[in-house]
Amino acid sequence: MSQFYLVAPSGYCLNQEAAYRGVQRLQEAGHQVLHQEVIPRRQQRFAGTEHQRLNDINQLATLEGANRIVLAVRGGYGASRLLPHIDWQALVARQRQNPLIICGHSDFTAIQMGLLAKGSIITFSGPMLAGNFGAEAMDPFTERHFWQALRSRNLPSNGRAKARIVGPWEPCGAAIWR
């Protein structure tokens, strides 16, 4: 059994039914789903006030327990507004001492890239609560590979690809915020 800890640093979850279906699906599989109060929370287009959403992220540094899976409820917009105020030092220290498994994509990627930039912290670009775990029928490929990525030390890497790059190629490098 795993413990999922929900965070909602971005947009309000428009599909509440899907989010609660995701919670139910995880619980029926034997997992605990904590911090569900973020699902219905709303401030204009966001999943709460900036203070609430920032607190969701900063409190991860002191979250008790090991091997917790931090799962974003959904993406959208809003995480980038939090970046200058996140306690990166505390989050990086936590991840180095007692790592949380942090998973999401879309707008949540800004926070994941912040962890990478500030401390070389590895996170998972993977399913989120509402759109994936809460889908009417969860994609079996997504579910299988999510658990494989979290539980296996050996990930499949036998694929090869060849492609011709088209269009202008512009190498870039910059901070994700100022």
Language-model-detected regions and their locations in the chain:
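N-terminal glycine-rich "phosphate-gripper" loop used for MgATP/nucleotide binding
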Residues: 71-85, 105
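Hydrophobic structural segments
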Residues: 60, 114, 172-173
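Short, acidic/small-residue loops that bind anionic groups at enzyme active sites
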Residues: 88-114, 122-129
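ATP/NTP phosphate-donor binding region
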Residues: 1-66
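Short glycine-/acidic-enriched loop or helix-start segments at secondary-structure transitions
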Residues: 16, 80-83, 112-114, 135
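Conserved anion/nucleotide-ligand pocket segment
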Residues: 121-178
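Structural motif
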Residues: 33, 69-71, 103
